[in-house]
Regions:
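Short functional hotspots at interaction and active-site rims
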Residues: 1-166
């Protein structure tokens, strides 16, 4: 942790972009259920696997950049493609790019790509999601998507609507 903070302190005037991904099961909200009048329904969700819609994005201050919605789970190939084709082109000045240590993040390759475009790459210390402010955004996003599902939208359309109005 100390090393991470020392390295970060070397860039006092460089903007930081935090990047991360999250996923939402399409069975997040049930439109119909039964319970006594006036009571909420609580039920177990079956062990069945449902389709997953995932999102990867960056956050600079309170602004979300380069969001990508995709079906399924993240792979190294998809992450590199998003990083090269969406994230890096959206950064118009040098940034410190900070991300977690997920297994599918090929750190050496991501560092090389960042440096080639004039950016700095800094992974978080292991097991430190509390340092990543985009985690708070994901929590808000999931709460808002759940609210939008109550209006009859699909998870996909709720996510698209949220990013358009954010």
């Amino acid at each position: 942790m100390r090393r991470y903070l020392d390295v970060l302190a070397c860039f006092p005037n460089t903007p930081i972009v935090y990047i991360d991904e999250t996923g939402i099961d399409t069975y997040l909200y049930r439109h119909k259920a039964r319970a006594p009048r006036g009571e909420k329904v609580y039920d177990k969700v079956s062990g069945r696997r449902f389709e997953r819609i995932s999102v990867v994005a960056g956050q600079i201050g309170s602004k979300i950049i380069a969001p990508l919605l995709y079906h399924g789970t993240m792979t190294a190939e998809l992450f590199i493609k998003w990083y090269q084709e969406q994230l890096l082109p959206s950064l118009t000045e040098p940034h410190v790019i900070i991300m977690d240590n997920a297994a599918f993040h090929p750190k050496k390759q991501l560092d090389e790509l960042a440096v080639a475009k004039g950016h700095y790459f800094l992974p978080f210390p292991p097991y430190s999601p509390e340092l990543n402010p985009i985690e708070q955004f994901w929590a808000t996003l999931k709460r808002k998507v759940t609210e939008l599902l109550r209006t009859g939208r699909s998870v996909q359309s709720a996510l698209e609507y949220y990013f358009k109005t954010k």
